[in-house]
Amino acid sequence: MASRTLSGALALAAAATAVLAAPATVAHRSPPGTKDVTAVLFEWDYVSVAKECTSTLGPAGYGYVQVSPPAEHIQGSQWWTSYQPVSYKIAGRLGDRAAFRSMVNTCHAAGVKVVVDTVINHMSAGSGTGTGGSSYTKYDYPGLYSAPDFDDCTAEITDYQDRWNVQHCELVGLADLDTGEEYVRQTIAGYMNDLLSLGVDGFRIDAATHIPAEDLANIKSRLSNPNAYWKQEVIYGAGEPPKPGEYTGTGDVQEFRYAYDLKRVFTQEHLAYLKNYGEDWGYLSSTTAGVFVDNHDTERNGSTLNYKNDATYTLANVFMLAWPYGAPDINSGYEWSDPDARPPDGGHVDACWQNGWKCQHKWPEIASMVAFRNATRGEPVTDWWDDGADAIAFGRGSKGFVAINHESATVQRTYQTSLPAGTYCDVQSNTTVTVDSAGRFTAALGPDTALALHNGRTSC
């Protein structure tokens, strides 16, 4: 959920509060297995997710799909209603328990693991009837929580320099759970164990910044599978406690600075600066970082690139998937002019690129780089080249090579690689490239295009 930036001026009385999405953490420090890319299908219903696992995510090589919060939530026409739970029943607008279970099973059959965006910092504001028929009022969620289960501070967070205020007061007026309390910890773990019983493979912990790290560690220790993938949304702020590094003991932490700086480099500076992108920039260790070009909050608040940046956005995703730092998320949502607008058709996706669904995970330039990443996993960066400005190229050992041209003119040159001699398919243009016995090839890249070769595709 949103730590600071809201999607709009929202009325508390109507429970109208937007919460920024939190990068989640993984117990494994990065997703386990050889496929570490997650497709974040934001506000897709579970029937649509299941179909996409079979038709696209599995064949493309995605390791994970992240689904939006499944718990019953407040009613309303905004996307952020999903982030205001009123019970832990799987009864949100995206599907019921049967649809959720079927989705998990279908994705597993396609070789794709399932991560759940999990809201455990707070419950809703306001009062009313939830999407699954449960009645609630703020601080009273029958059969689940009552007033003693919430933090004593019932005021909104006002001071991000004050750790206690950040972690014990209310995020945009939402009822803040006392996660230091035994019953609350037990109840949250019960919810997550229920999801594990349905086959989920991991969790993204929304608004983790607002939960003490020791509370999350305690909750995680109660899981039936304590090795579940675990990634946490902890937003770095200069001079602000808590710090992302406090949370790496339980899993991955999403590295917001990576996304912020990527926007600045691609729009104001030079791609040549990316030669040492990652830990040398002061970021978390690659083994504990979750990275992204944008997420559902940042695409709306302007702090990162988003789909409206067109080719610049595409190239940033190509770079992220080619560069060996962190575990990448590919944000895949829908068009919006109103940043609060809920998904088209209640989250049902009949087809990509229709009815406003952007399906970034399926854009050929992005989807093709998932296999590139899988093929080059563990290989170092080699053969770096740049023109001092916005054309760069680099290899991934003997397994792959990428060139990106963010200049306004065509770049034609001979590239030196560490690839074995032979023919390769440029998965960006779907054309064949021949590498000679010295590891060289010549290519012309038009403005705002890329080239990517890997040893998993030797023909087009």
From Swiss-Prot:
Say if the entry is tagged with keyword Hydrolase. Answer: yes
Q: Which reaction does it catalyse?
A: Endohydrolysis of (1->4)-alpha-D-glucosidic linkages in polysaccharides containing three or more (1->4)-alpha-linked D-glucose units
- Which InterPro entries does its entry note? A-amylase/branching_C (IPR006048), A-amylase_C (IPR031319), Alpha_amylase (IPR006046), Glyco_hydro_13_cat_dom (IPR006047), Glyco_hydro_b (IPR013780), Glycoside_hydrolase_SF (IPR017853)
Q: Which Pfam families does the protein's record reference?
A: Alpha-amylase, Alpha-amylase_C
Q: Which residues bind Ca(2+)?
A: N121, Q167, D176, H210
- Catalytic residue list: D206, E233
Cofactor(s) for this UniProt protein: Ca(2+)
Molecular function (GO) terms listed?
alpha-amylase activity; metal ion binding
Domain of life of the source: Bacteria
Record-marked site positions (Transition state stabilizer): D297
> What is the name listed in the Swiss-Prot or TrEMBL entry for this protein?
Alpha-amylase
Q: Which organism is it from?
A: Streptomyces thermoviolaceus
Q: What is the lineage of its organism?
A: Bacteria, Bacillati, Actinomycetota, Actinomycetes, Kitasatosporales
Which gene is the coding source of this polypeptide chain?
amy
